[in-house]
Amino acid sequence: MANYAIGDVQGCFFELKGLLDKINFDPAQDKLWFVGDLINRGPDSFRTIEFIYKIKDSCNVVLGNHDIHFLAIAENLRKPFKEDTLKQLLESENLNLYKKWLRNQNLLYYENIQCEDGNKIYLMTHAGIPPHWSWQDAMEAAQEIKAALSDDKLYRDYLSNIYGNLPNKSEPNLNRIDRMRLNTNYLTRMRFCKSDGELELEAKGIESDKPKGFNAWFNHPLTIKNENLHLIFGHWAALGGKTNIEKIIAIDTGCVWGYKLSAYRLEDSKVFSYDRIT
């Protein structure tokens, strides 16, 4: 048995299948950790979701910004962008099935894994963990969002109110909607921030392109860090899968942009990649 963290698939179905063949994935024994953005921008969002849903019992999934964007469009709460590739999925006879499944996924997942060099705690989110968050902060933020998304009475209200760049930092008296919008941005959109968690959400380039006064979230001292904790994230293709920090693992290697889809085996830190073919 092995655990593999998989980078942003974004509808690159054939590359996903090729990567799984390369690692000899066995759904009866292995686990896939999908870092979010399963769909959109790539050529085959429908077949990607259809396939992952079929093997869902062998998958741990966290939601990315594109997955949440899809849910909002599917509820007629948000209009598609011209570059979206969600039409076939939105017209699928199984649309409600896939919506409900995605709504019940997490924004954060963690597990203790026995590795070749000892026990490690792997924690996965789509975009990262802001530097000022403790373990409890992260758990509470993710759980509040999951509870809203999975609740038939609350999820439309959540999806209607999460878009926007403000508030851009934690404040003691934020109302529930503002708090969830900020925390959704931390978990699914963050790249650059300040040490107190103040976000800058416009810049998308490499760390050397950082806005004045901001750093990549992982280059700040992280409150959540401990000796056995390893963080896995996607979202930031411009990093090319590198943070230069041993216990912070970037796994988005830009498949949808013409580069490659990557898998990181948790037990021995080996990386496998499959080049973009479509």
Annotate each language-model stretch with its function:
Residues 5, 34, 61-62, 123, ...:
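Residue-level marker for buried hydrophobic side chains located in beta-strands
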Residues 46-49, 54-176:
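Active-site neighborhood of divalent metal-dependent phosphoester bond hydrolases
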Residues 8, 37, 52, 64-65, ...:
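Divalent metal-coordination and catalytic microenvironments
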Residues 3-10, 122-128, 250-251:
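Active-site-proximal beta-strand elements of phosphoester/diester hydrolases
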Residues 12-14, 40-42, 67-72, 132, ...:
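Active-site environment of divalent metal-dependent phosphoester hydrolases
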Residues 1-54, 68:
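N-terminal active-site segment of His-dependent metallophosphoesterases
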